[in-house]
Regions:
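Acyl-donor (CoA/ACP) binding surface of acyl/acetyltransferases
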Residues: 1-49, 79-188
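A short helix-loop-beta-strand connector motif used in the catalytic cores of GNAT acetyltransferases and
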Residues: 68-83
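Conserved GNAT-fold acetyl-CoA-binding loop/helix
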Residues: 45-69
């Protein structure tokens, strides 16, 4: 169950324009996102930390299924990971945002940026916007980030966000540290 909404807040509707940052647009999923999401997940280095089995997604049907899970999270929960679009080009750069499926250890803001867009600070920029939105929208004291112990780039993003390791979990058979961003320490 998602946390209670703050008083007077409503969840995004299908025509919601999204969140804009200096360089990015965070928005809901479209059919046109399936191919670039599949391309992102075909990279072994990306798939290792994002796909359920840690293997690259190379079959179009599996890419569609993964995108349907992301889009379906919005339908079933009213929230979900945003598609991250580069404002200057309109290109799909990844997915970042709230993720809270059944049996998850808490309300997460996660991130995954396509290989060709890494090193530009997009994960941090989009995650910061997602955390700001989540704290503004929900009655939350903390937001978690489940990060594989070998995923140094994601750990660096979490540190930059001010998150700290406060536990561990096993998700889909993979050990992960639970990084936590606390509302009362969040600088936004």
């Amino acid at each position: 169950m998602i946390p209670p909404l703050k008083t007077g807040v409503t969840l995004p509707q299908p025509n919601w324009p999204g969140i804009e940052t200096e360089r990015l647009i965070l928005r809901q999923w479209r059919a046109s996102d399936v191919a670039p999401n599949t391309m992102m997940l075909s990279d072994p280095g990306t798939a290792r930390y994002i796909t359920a089995d840690g293997k690259p997604i190379t079959e179009p049907m599996n890419g569609w299924r993964n995108s349907a899970i992301m889009a379906g999270h919005w339908v079933l929960k009213g929230i979900g990971m945003f598609v991250v679009e580069e404002k200057a080009t309109g290109k799909f750069t990844g997915r970042v945002g709230p993720f809270f499926p059944p049996s998850w250890p808490g309300f997460e803001v996660g991130w995954g940026i396509a290989k060709e867009f890494r090193g530009k600070g997009y994960a941090f920029e989009a995650a910061r916007a997602s955390i700001n939105w989540s704290f503004a929208t929900f009655e939350l004291d903390k937001i978690i980030h489940c990060i594989d112990r070998e995923n140094a780039p994601s750990q660096a993003v979490a540190r930059r966000l001010g998150a700290t390791i406060e536990g561990e979990t096993v998700l889909l058979g993979h050990a992960a540290d639970i990084w936590v961003t606390h509302r009362d320490r969040w600088a936004g």
